[in-house]
Amino acid sequence: MFVGREKEIERINRFISKRGALIVYGLRRVGKTTLIKKALGDKKIKFVYFECQKANEKTNVDLFVDLLKESISFTDASFPSFLALFKELNQRYKDYVFVIDEYSYMKEYYLESKKSKSKLEAQRIDSEFQNIIDDYLTNNNLILSGSSIYIMEKLMDHESPLYGRFVGSIVLKQFTYLEAKMMLPSLTDNDLIAFYSVFGGSPYVLERINQQKNLKDNICELLLNEDGKLRNHLKNNVINELESDPDLHEILNVIKNGCKKYNEIENQSHITTSGLLDKRLKKLLDLDIIEAKYLIGREDDKRKKYYEIKDNLLKFYYAYVFRQDNKMNFLGEERFYELFIEPSIKTYISHRFESIVKSYFSESIKRGYNRDIVEVGTFFFDNNEYDCVAKKIDGTYVFFEVKYYSKPMKRDEMEKEMEQLKNVKGLKVSQIGFVCNAGFEEKLPNVIYLDLADFFFKS
């Protein structure tokens, strides 16, 4: 089922009308291959799609030639390099798009090798593709795609041979909650919030959700079951990649469903050397598994920086599933859920709901609403966390208290929160707002209120 990605398809269509190279990248299973094939297929463009293996250049060239023989009756000749191959392709074919997916796999083969000249080989391949783009795309187009955010972004760095060679770049991200709704149309708005909080926005993940079953049954079947499709998906595509360095697991296990500052990670993990912790955090940032955030209005204060796992599904995995195999095998998925997930699942969802609220503001601004808001973030004051704080054009701030409830928010709770805000220092508070998925018992004057009808733009 293909939904969304209209802007990305439009950009690929514009690229096709030119000559040159496009770079497309994003995490595994985010839909890069599906997007590229959909865009090219809809326009009936002639294309050849090749996925690199984690092997040397010659092996990948030979595999690509084998594919070309099958798909476009290519020559039986052997080629020593991609440069020689594309020289031939440019002479013999016209108006093709050649897609080289997982370019980063081939780069990783050299970068991870212990041989002394391997890094030079990786740079040489980039130089080859520089020559291909400069000299051998006069008749065709090239798309380079990859899952390693770090490697693919490095291709566009000013020190890379490929700097300035791409006519465009597309960073493919997970679906927002609104796009996820298009893939899960049978869910109620409230259920969608809960499902998105647990499973996130990967199209691959969303396709495996059974919309006829409740959240508990989907978690048990997909994540707690020993053969669960999403449990295996995480192990194969994320967890196994981290196995060579247990410190990475340690950091993620500390962060889990929350936001952790550097000193909190340092104190709660077993990584006592600050230099080592810095390296491990950089590794997770490069892998695009975590992100570093700053408090709104405190962007220059590096001490206030905190770290968070980006993907909801991975958050859930580390919060509940990681290192729990023995318990799950002994208890079975149903009983494990009842004992270790059910008591805190609403709290877990409430934390993720805060992120969805921030996503709502971004979407609303793009739709022409809330035009006076320029930034949304989090703020800590006097041991209190303010979930969602919006900075306005005039430099003042609107503080939103976010609640994920099964019943409407009560007046006395709102009044208590408003009283507490009087003590906030450091930011100029112009207004307060309340966000509750279940609505409100009553509404007070001069206060902003948001509920699910607003989130799905139904009001």
Model-derived segments and their meaning:
Residues 305-459:
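A cross-kingdom feature that marks ATP-driven nucleic-acid transaction machinery
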Residues 1-334:
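Phosphate-binding site recognition
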